[in-house]
């Protein structure tokens, strides 16, 4: 029911795919989603089904895509597990949540899994269950798969569904270990609140991105440097996981600050 869930459902339905939404609040959803994108276009996608009952949608789904934060993945996998078919590909909109590890533990090591390295879109909900904003596309998406024999078909399907080029990674760790939100969020929160002490009150909500400062960028770069050293000790390729400065087209803390403030 978050921004990515709304936008991906609307985009895929608009492209002609049969899309169902499994949500705890089906009564708040319209049968058709309205999507406004960053290119000035507005379009709609008609949903095949919106329900809170996994038995109504999971058994006949070829692809199940979880658009959930990490803490909610285990509960949802347990919720849908009795209705999953052997042919079903189960994926996560981002893999840094620990999706592959949790899915292995719950569904077993023969489950057909896939996961995105980074979220496909920058997305926000405007009106829950009715309209969402697609605020940014990615130039390219990267996914990892496990136990999917026809991964080329899945890749082509996702490319068509999301209207974005998709590239296959070599190992699920290349999708699971990312230097995006798992580094960005802690670095920013630490820089905002490390001076807190008992009795200290904040009189306004600090801007997460729009007031991003160089202290946050310096800490983020330091975290990424350590992260890159960890990657070198693991059986993964470094090329699919660029440094944060490379990813954000920046060269130091000052330029990174300008870039992140513009998000």
What are these model-derived regions, one by one?
Residues 66, 70-129:
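Rossmann-like NAD(P)(H) cofactor-binding subdomain of soluble oxidoreductases
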